[in-house]
Every structure is written in C-alpha cells, then in structure tokens.
C-alpha cells in the first residue's frame, strides 16, 4: 500500500510541529535542576503500588520502567513528558483532519499546541500532567471517530484510553462525565442503544478497578488529600478570575483561536459533544470556586483544532483571505515571546529580567508566597544544597547516634531530595508525614535522635528533651518557605515515634 499520501497529507504538518516541540524541550531540559515533584516521584517509583495518596499508579510505573532502562538523569527523566507533549501536538493535527480542516488549519492548530505556556510547563518535568493532556486529547479524537463510524473498534480504543487515563489521573472522570452528558443532550444519544459506549465504560472501569481496591484497602487517602488541598491549599477563584487566568495560562495569543473553536464545536451537530465536554468541565471547576485554573488546560486540543478549521473555512472566501496571515501573525508575534515563560530556556538571572521586561508574573495558584521566580521554576532550586547541609549535621553525630538517627522532613520535596541526593553524602533514607511518605511509616525510627528538616522554628521544642537549631537552608531562587528553613537536631522524643505517627499525618 502506498503510504505517501498519509505522510504528505494528514501527518506531515503535525509531525513537523511535534518535532519543533521536542526541540524546544531539548534546549531546556538541563537548564535548571530537578523539580520538587520529580524527586518525590522517584521515591514513589522505588515503592511500586496500585496507588499513592496523591495519584494513581500509571505514571509512577512508567517512571520505574524508565529508571531501569535509562536511569534518572534530567534528560532520562524528562524525555517521556516531552514525548507525551509531542504526541498531543500530533493528535491536535489529527483532530483538525477529523473536523474537516486542511493543511493551514493543521499548521495553525499545531502551532497553538506548541506555544501553550502551561503545556510547555507540564511537558518539561516528569509528572502525570503531561500524560493527562495526551490522554484527554486522544480520548477526544477517539470519541469523535466512535460517534462518526459507529464501529466497535473506536469504542474499544476509547475505553482503553479512558481506563489508562484514569490510572494516570482521576480527573479523566470529568472527561467521561462530560462525554456522557454530551451524548445525552445531542442526537448522538441513539448510540446508547448500541454496545459501543457500554463496552467502553466497562473497559475503563475494569482497568481502573485495581486502584479503587487500593483506595478501599488504605482508607480512601486520596479523598482526604483532595479535601485538604481544596480547603487549605488552593486559592479561591471567582468566575472572572478563572477565565482571566485561562486566557493567561493558555496565552492571550491563542484566545481567539480556542474561543472560535468552542463556538464552532457547540454549533456543530456532529462534534457538539466535544464542546459540551469542555463547557461541563469548565462549569464544574468554576462552581467549585477553589480549583486550580490549570485543571482545564487538558481540554483545549479539540478547541484549537475546531478553531483553526473554522478560520481556514472563513478564509476560503477571498474577502476574508486576510484571516490566514493575521491569525498566524497574532499567534507567532504574541505567542513566541511567551515561550521562555513556560520553559526555562534562559539562565535564571536573565529570566528574572525578561519576565520583568514583558510584565509577566503568574498569579499564585496555591496559598504560598512567591519569590523572584514562579513556583514552577523556583521548585527546581536548592535541593542538593539541602541534602548537603543535612549531611553535615548527620556526620557531626557520634557513630552510636548516627546508627539510630532518623531524618524527618516536613514535606515530600525535602524528603525526596534527601532520598535522591542523600546517598552521595552518606545519608539514610528520609521519613516524612507528608502524603505517601506517611504511608511508608517511620521505618523503625524511635525518635531518640532525629534531624528534623523544615517546619516552623518553634515546632519541635515541646516534644523533645533537647532541641538544637543546627543549620538553616540557603537558596536564593527557591520558594521563600524553603529558604531559611530550619534544620533541627532533636533528642529524646517524649513518646515513641510510631505512636505519634497517626497524629502528624498530613495529606495535601
């Protein structure tokens, strides 16, 4: 069979833009250091399970396999999210074709997918979020094909993608709920009389079932995690602020494209379901009042595709031919200068100056103070120095105390840093009360001798016979609460640590 029409037609432009996306990430991959969450995920990957306090197991399982094959250098760690991001660009191009668009529409939509600042952020570091965008985009393409073709094949594919997506991040439930609502509210409801949708739902449920069993066995820790994060960590966001942040996170340059795309989807009898998915998820997030605005970022690929196809159709009229160059100019002239906001392409001092020059400073999405860098970059600084400082305290102890000394970290970033960088400085594994570290327990430490990292300066004094402030962290570009964090040397916990463990649990 001659494959040239496929490569020269439907895939040529998306593949080119996907390659550009990969090139951008390759330029930035080692510019700064390991991100806080990456260090934690590496610790999780050493302890495989069917679930974790703050996420399902799929991305951690992928990381475990990846570490076995290629190690855990920055390049080894980050090629997978970059590939997932490139896959999202490719799927966006295929969505354009499925919606009737041609090469210009593919070029415009895929260019949008490359330049989205928040997608650049999540595709730079290893996390479930890069795969989440990929699964949402692929699910949208398969849903459209399933509704168009009426065959079982696309429905089976959709079920598998939904199931894997759920094993990656439970927010895939929003897609499933939005798709079900869209089918019920449109003429596509007739497909509910066929096997396809029910088979897809069954497959997704079966794939997700082991994680549900894990949740039951562990007392539904993720529900506690979500409740605490919503109440104590997320910033309250109103309707206007939510949509203002959508425009900012997705880039003002891309706003006209996705707005046209949303209108085009809702006006389309054939693809209205995809528009309803977006609207229903957005409505849910706005109604919650405290969700992070970037949660909706996973749902934009169909909007870019539909918007680009609509602009291409409108520009087919000679009187509106100007739409093509104007659309490309807006996307490029405004979108390109924002790339260093999403990717650490610049040395840190130049980034600080550049962000001040263009007036970009992201609004905090959590209840924390920002430093000179936004949190997505600040959390890449200070971790090895933290381990080095803890090691100095640890090795200052007599051998008898070192043998029973535990290192208790206030949060999973600090604990992950001790676990990752600690072996080169002769440190034992860390323990922590934060998220999945709490499930791993105190590991036999009694509290007789503890090095406590982080927290408030008055935290441990009432619990120990002796408390010494041994050192403090010092990192210019890290998050302010990590700079100057105390490192305590504590002796004589007033009760066994195993007994205190339940009291100090913190899921958020």
For each feature predicted by the language model, list its residue ranges:
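Membrane-interface transmembrane helices that cradle and orient dolichyl/undecaprenyl
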Residues: 3-4, 97-100, 139-155, 189, ...
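Short helix- or helix-capping micro-motifs
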Residues: 18, 109-117, 162, 166, ...
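Signature aromatic-anchored transmembrane alpha helix within multi-pass, membrane-resident enzymes
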Residues: 313-355
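Membrane-interface alpha helices of multi-pass inner-membrane proteins
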Residues: 47, 110, 142, 154-169, ...
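Transmembrane-helix motifs of polytopic, lipid-linked glycan transferases
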Residues: 79-100, 138, 142
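Transmembrane-lumen/periplasm boundary regions of multi-pass, lipid-linked membrane glycan transferases
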Residues: 164, 173-270, 286-289, 340-344
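Short acidic/glycine- and proline-prone juxtamembrane loop motifs at membrane-interface regions
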Residues: 118, 124-132
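Specific aromatic-rich, kink-prone transmembrane helix
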Residues: 46, 91, 112, 131-149, ...
């Amino acid at each position: 069979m001659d494959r040239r029409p496929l490569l020269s037609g439907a895939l040529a432009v998306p593949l080119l833009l996907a390659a550009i996306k990969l090139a951008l990430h390759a330029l930035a991959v080692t510019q700064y250091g390991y991100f806080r969450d990456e260090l934690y995920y590496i610790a999780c990957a050493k302890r495989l399970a069917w679930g974790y306090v703050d996420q399902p197991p799929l991305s951690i399982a992928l990381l475990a396999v990846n570490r076995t094959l290629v190690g855990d250098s920055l390049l080894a760690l980050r090629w997978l999210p970059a590939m997932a991001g490139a896959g999202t660009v490719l799927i966006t191009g295929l969505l354009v074709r499925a919606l009737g668009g041609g090469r210009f529409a593919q070029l415009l939509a895929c260019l949008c997918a490359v330049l989205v600042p928040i997608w650049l952020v999540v595709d730079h570091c290893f996390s479930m979020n890069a795969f989440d965008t990929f699964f949402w985009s692929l699910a949208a393409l398969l849903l459209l094909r399933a509704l168009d073709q009426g065959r079982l094949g696309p429905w089976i594919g959709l079920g598998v993608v939904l199931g894997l997506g759920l094993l990656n991040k439970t927010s895939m439930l929003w897609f499933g709920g939005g798709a079900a609502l869209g089918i019920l509210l449109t003429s596509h409801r007739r497909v509910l009389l066929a096997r396809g949708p029910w088979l897809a739902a069954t497959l997704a449920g079966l794939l997700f079932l082991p994680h549900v069993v894990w949740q039951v066995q562990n007392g539904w820790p993720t529900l506690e995690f979500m409740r605490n994060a919503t109440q104590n960590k997320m910033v309250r966001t109103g309707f206007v602020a939510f949509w203002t942040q959508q425009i900012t996170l997705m880039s003002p340059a891309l706003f006209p494209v996705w707005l046209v795309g949303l209108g085009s989807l809702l006006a389309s009898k054939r693809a209205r379901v995809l528009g309803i998915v977006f609207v229903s998820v957005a409505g849910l997030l706005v109604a919650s009042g405290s969700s992070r605005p970037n949660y909706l970022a996973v749902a934009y690929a169909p909007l870019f595709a539909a918007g680009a196809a609509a602009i291409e159709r409108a520009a087919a009229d000679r009187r509106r031919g100007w739409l093509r160059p104007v659309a490309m100019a807006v996307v490029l002239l405004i979108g390109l200068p924002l790339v260093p906001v999403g990717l650490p392409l610049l040395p840190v001092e130049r980034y600080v100056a550049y962000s001040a020059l263009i007036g970009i400073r992201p609004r905090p999405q959590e209840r924390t103070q920002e430093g000179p860098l936004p949190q997505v970059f600040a959390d890449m600084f200070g971790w090895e120095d933290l381990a080095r400082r803890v090691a100095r305290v640890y090795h200052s102890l007599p051998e008898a105390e070192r043998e029973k000394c535990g290192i208790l970290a206030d949060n999973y970033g600090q604990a992950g840093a001790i676990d990752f960088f600690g072996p080169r400085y002769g440190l034992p594994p860390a323990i922590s009360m934060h998220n999945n570290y709490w499930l791993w327990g105190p590991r036999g430490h009694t509290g007789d001798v503890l090095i406590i990292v982080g927290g408030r300066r008055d935290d441990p004094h009432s619990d120990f016979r002796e408390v010494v402030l041994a050192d403090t962290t010092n990192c210019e570009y890290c998050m302010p609460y990590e700079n100057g964090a105390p490192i305590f040397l504590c002796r004589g916990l007033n009760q066994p640590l195993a007994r205190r463990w339940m009291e100090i649990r913190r899921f958020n």
